[in-house]
């Protein structure tokens, strides 16, 4: 869905204009047999790659794309001003159940439940001005543009099981621990510039003198929070169901007072 609207009109000796645009898009994709395999090359004399891991399974991806743009401009006989703000955002959630066959090293078969949620956004503000001074002999043009970027993995859940005779076994030494991850990247930047142009006459010929300045700043923050779920003993129902929801059931969480 998309909605756009703009107009321009006069207010006395000034001209005023504005523009607005809103957009929303949603997508859903289902890959019934997604595959991601790893191979290795053993020797220069062997041209066939050797299987390391063969991974396949259903993968579903749901994505939304909202965006907004608002701008306003003002024009006078000696100056022009513009202000514009834009916001772009993308949120995606992935769910997958993979079957993995490790065929090199510690050979085993695994089932992996994976849930991921990611959100990315960009917000930009643009301020612009242009001025005609001294009867137009001097032109001053400036821009100020801060930008805010975010990329957040708001939740990643990884639950691996080794499949053993039709059942499911938690075996961290072969499959790794069930893990939950949060990642957060924030970036803030600022770009500012000014340009001066002076028009004059030199030896009866038109000439220009230009000068300007630029400032660019950027700051980035990144952090990760991760915890792995460790086990003492068996969890009832895991072997027959392979249900990762059983990991954090109240009855299965160790209590220091028990």
Please place each PLM-identified region on the residue numbering.
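Extended aliphatic helical segments
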Residues: 11, 16-22, 52, 64, ...
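Short acidic, glycine-rich loop/turn motifs
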Residues: 7-9, 103, 133, 200
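Flexible, surface-exposed loop regions and adjacent strand-edge segments
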Residues: 33-44, 88-90, 97-109, 156-166, ...
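Outer-membrane beta-barrel domain signature
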Residues: 57-59, 108, 112-116, 181-185
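Generic N-terminal amphipathic/basic segments
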Residues: 91-96, 105, 109, 113-122, ...
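Transmembrane beta-barrel wall of Gram-negative outer-membrane proteins
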Residues: 1-96, 120-125
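Flexible, solvent-exposed coil segments and beta strand-coil junctions
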Residues: 42-54, 100-111, 164-178, 254-258
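Face-selective signature of the C-terminal outer-membrane beta-barrel domain
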Residues: 75, 79, 84, 118-258
């Amino acid at each position: 869905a998309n909605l756009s609207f703009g107009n321009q009109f006069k207010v006395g000796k000034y001209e005023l204009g504005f523009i607005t645009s809103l957009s929303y898009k949603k997508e859903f994709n289902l890959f019934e047999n997604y595959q991601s395999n790893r191979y290795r090359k053993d020797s220069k004399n062997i041209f066939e790659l050797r299987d390391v891991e063969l991974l396949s399974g259903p993968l579903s991806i749901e994505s939304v794309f909202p965006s907004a743009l608002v701008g306003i401009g003002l024009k006078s006989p000696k100056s022009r001003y513009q202000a514009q703000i834009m916001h772009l955002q993308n949120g995606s959630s992935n769910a997958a159940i993979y079957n993995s066959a490790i065929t090199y090293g510690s050979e085993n078969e695994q089932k992996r439940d994976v849930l991921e949620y990611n959100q990315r956004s960009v917000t930009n503000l643009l301020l612009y001005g242009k001025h005609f001074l001294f009867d137009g002999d001097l032109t001053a043009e400036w821009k100020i543009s801060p930008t805010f970027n975010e990329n957040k993995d708001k939740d990643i859940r990884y639950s691996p099981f080794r499949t053993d005779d039709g059942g499911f076994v938690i075996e961290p030494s072969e499959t790794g621990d069930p893990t939950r991850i949060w990642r957060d990247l924030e970036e803030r930047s600022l770009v500012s510039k000014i340009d001066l142009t002076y028009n004059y006459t030199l030896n009866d010929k038109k000439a220009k003198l230009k000068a300007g300045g630029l400032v660019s700043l950027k700051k980035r923050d990144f952090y990760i929070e991760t915890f792995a779920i460790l086990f003492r003993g068996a969890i009832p129902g895991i072997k027959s169901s392979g249900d990762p929801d059983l990991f954090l059931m109240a009855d299965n969480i160790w209590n220091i007072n028990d």
